[in-house]
Amino acid sequence: MNYNCEIQNRNSKNVDNQVSLPPIQVLFNSIEKRSMPELAFSNIEYSHGNLRSSTEEQNYPAPVLLPQHHSIAYPAINSGGTSTTATPTASTVETSKTSSSAMDTQSQYGSSKKSKSASDDAKPCYKSAPIYEIINKEKDAGAQYNRPFSDFVESKSRRKQNSGRRSNLPKETVQILNTWLLNHLNNPYPTQQEKRELLIKTGLTKIQLSNWFINVRRRKIFSDYYTLVNSIPNDNANNTPVERVQNVSAYHNTLSATNNTMYDATSTCSTDYELSKRFAHAPVTRRKKLIDRLEELKKLSNPDMN
């Protein structure tokens, strides 16, 4: 009862002692400028070389605020029953700013940690070669192998269309080469100096010039071979030795006349040594067949070897 009476007495009094606060700008200007408190883990340095794998748990120290001595303002109830707020001091405003900045720092740190963990899950950091690159390469290779057969057929047809047909040499170039060949029928193998001169005159490459001479020599050898085969006399078992000698002499006369007419490279060949010396530098291309033809030519030109 006494307590209720006391409250009624307080309410009956005039409320003259209410607190009036100055503008907020004046209060902010009156606050002393202080440096922000440092976090306890700010001096810890993290290097990229010491980063651990994403499979391991990364425990970072939680931010700890330095102790601050401040007073907390609570709302006060005056004698008239109305609640009033006490005047905020400089320490109170500074404490509120410090707590808000600390909360912002913690939230930023937490968000950065979450984003980092998400990026680590998406693209893990391996000590060796990244496995995801190897997997992607294998997938690309598998996709190439799984291409339909029609694509390969189309690409092959395109390559055939792009590769033009091999054209013949110009007439002027062939005339220059034939002139040189007629002047060197006994030995149709140009020296290095002669090759350089022919390259300058014809404008061909070394490969083109070599291929032309290889083809020409091959044609002459085969031509000589078939000419000899067709001109061999048929030796019957009934022929006498005298008749065989006459046939051989007639065969040699026919061979010499044929060689002089066709300007063959073996026209002046009289011995096996000269023949082997003349064709010592036979081309490597289809060498087996050329050697076989040469051996048969030797046997046909020298009946004594049979």
UniProtKB/Swiss-Prot annotation:
Record's subcellular location: Nucleus
Species: Saccharomyces cerevisiae (strain ATCC 204508 / S288c)
Biased composition (Low complexity): 79-96
Protein name: Homeobox protein CUP9
Family the entry assigns: Belongs to the TALE/CUP9 homeobox family.
GO cellular component: nucleus
SS bond list: none
Family annotation (SUPFAM superfamilies): Homeodomain-like
Role, per record: Probable DNA-binding protein which plays a role in protecting yeast cells against copper toxicity. May regulate the expression of important copper homeostatic genes.
InterPro entries: HD (IPR001356), Homeodomain-like_sf (IPR009057), KN_HD (IPR008422), TALE_homeobox (IPR050224)
Disordered: annotated segments: 75-123
Source species, domain of life: Eukaryota
Keywords, alphabetical: DNA-binding, Homeobox, Nucleus
Molecular function via GO: RNA polymerase II cis-regulatory region sequence-specific DNA binding; RNA polymerase II-specific DNA-binding transcription factor binding; sequence-specific DNA binding
Note, other: Present with 521 molecules/cell in log phase SD medium.
